[in-house]
Amino acid sequence: MSLLEFFRPQKKTSASLAKERLQIIVAERRSQNDPAPSYLPQLKEDILKVISKYVDIDPNMVDLTFEHKDDDISVLELNVKLPDDEK
């Protein structure tokens, strides 16, 4: 390796540039689309049915959210406000 090659930046191949650009486009489209899966409303109803077997609960007191943290990580968060008294 000569001294000039050390200070000169390495040129990226057109294939690697195309791959990087495609990854950026795919990531943008994933974030723009509806990130929530289609089964979430049914999942929320099923969870409500199970909880209501044990506790009287208002369906408006259940909050189900879904979000993508990274390409590999998705978070499903369920918040249920339970009443003070049990069934």
UniProtKB/Swiss-Prot annotation:
Show the stretches that span the lipid bilayer. none
Stored InterPro entries? MinE (IPR005527), MinE_sf (IPR036707)
One GO biological process this protein is involved in is: cell division
Per the record, a Pfam family? MinE
Per UniProt, the keywords (alphabetical) are: Cell cycle, Cell division
The coiled-coil segments of this chain are none
Give the family this protein belongs to, as stated in its UniProt record: Belongs to the MinE family.
Cited function: Prevents the cell division inhibition by proteins MinC and MinD at internal division sites while permitting inhibition at polar sites. This ensures cell division at the proper site by restricting the formation of a division septum at the midpoint of the long axis of the cell.
Its recorded name reads Cell division topological specificity factor
Organism, as annotated: Vibrio parahaemolyticus serotype O3:K6 (strain RIMD 2210633)
